[in-house]
């Protein structure tokens, strides 16, 4: 009888523990308050820092507390072109300058934004990866909503009170640089999660994977498997509608979609 394979072992065990030891902290907008709703607050970028496990750089921004004699430090996802010593403005009356944070209703159609809120006050969840940006498509004043185009190309309707940062996230083109060696991949993933290296099933022994064994690396049977297959057998192309290259009408439809 074969062993408990990797796909089965992944499902067992304790709750995943994130690799957060050297992380700089959560990157969020300021908590939404009276000052941002009705005017603006001024902050200064004190440093641009690298956060292990994250592709985009972070900006540490210092604000004066609105009504106490102290300072507030916030971590923002850095926008392309942001620099140390730059003044940032957050609020309804802030200007349209890269790095400033405004509600979507104050941003004109066609503007490039990033780190967009999904719900008012959630401090930014959309278009946050390095090089990402969203585009403001249209405003609907009747329902007080805004339609935006996400990095995936899909369109989304969010409340017009949601905040966004002007510009696109810094670090664009990061994935275009090749890894070149296994050591770089090792250091990349060790600060993210235990997801590397991945051994292929055909490279294993028959006891370790249904695709293992043989005098050369081949699966030896159909790679498709039914939806209700038992654990340990359910590997490969699960409940696939079709396999192989797109040909004919399907290829033409896919090319048209791109």
Curated annotation (Swiss-Prot):
SUPFAM superfamilies: Nucleic acid-binding proteins, Translation proteins SH3-like domain. InterPro entries: NA-bd_OB-fold, Rib_uL2_dom2, Ribosomal_uL2, Ribosomal_uL2_arc_euk, Ribosomal_uL2_C, Ribosomal_uL2_CS, Ribosomal_uL2_dom3, Ribosomal_uL2_RNA-bd_dom. This is Large ribosomal subunit protein uL2z. NCBIfam families: PRK09612.1 (NF007180). GO terms for cellular component: cytosolic large ribosomal subunit; cytosolic ribosome; mitochondrion; nucleolus; plant-type vacuole; vacuole. Belongs to the universal ribosomal protein uL2 family. It is found in: Cytoplasm. GO terms for biological process: translation. It holds the Pfam family Ribosomal_L2. The lineage of its organism: Eukaryota, Viridiplantae, Streptophyta, Embryophyta, Tracheophyta. Signal peptide: none annotated. Disulfide bonds: none annotated. Gene3D superfamilies: 2.30.30.30, Nucleic acid-binding proteins, Ribosomal protein L2, domain 3. Residues 210-230 are annotated as: Disordered. Keywords: Cytoplasm, Ribonucleoprotein, Ribosomal protein. GO terms for molecular function: mRNA binding; structural constituent of ribosome.
């Amino acid at each position: 009888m074969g062993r408990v394979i990797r796909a089965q072992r992944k499902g067992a065990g304790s709750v995943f523990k994130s690799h957060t030891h050297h992380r700089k902290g959560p990157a969020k907008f300021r908590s939404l308050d009276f000052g941002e709703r009705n005017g603006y607050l001024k902050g200064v970028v004190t440093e641009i820092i690298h956060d292990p496990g994250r592709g985009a750089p972070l900006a540490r921004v210092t604000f004066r507390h609105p009504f106490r004699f102290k300072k507030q430090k916030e971590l923002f996802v850095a926008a392309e072109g942001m620099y140390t010593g730059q003044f940032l403005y957050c609020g309804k009356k802030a200007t349209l300058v890269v790095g400033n944070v405004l509600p979507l209703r104050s941003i004109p159609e066609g503007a490039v934004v990033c780190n967009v809120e999904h719900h008012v006050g959630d401090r930014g969840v959309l278009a946050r990866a390095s090089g990402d940006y969203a585009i403001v498509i249209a405003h609907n004043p009747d329902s007080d909503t805004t339609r935006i185009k996400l990095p995936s190309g899909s369109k989304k309707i969010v409340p017009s009170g949601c905040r966004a940062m002007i510009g696109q996230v810094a670090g664009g083109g990061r994935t275009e640089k090749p890894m070149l060696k296994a050591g770089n991949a090792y250091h990349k993933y060790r600060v993210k999660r235990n997801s590397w290296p991945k051994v292929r099933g055909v490279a294993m022994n028959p006891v370790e994977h249904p695709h293992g064994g043989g005098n050369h690396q081949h699966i030896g049977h159909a790679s498709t498997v039914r939806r209700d297959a038992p654990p340990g057998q359910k590997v490969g192309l699960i409940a696939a509608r079709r396999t192989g290259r797109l040909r004919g009408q399907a290829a033409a439809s896919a090319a048209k979609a791109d």
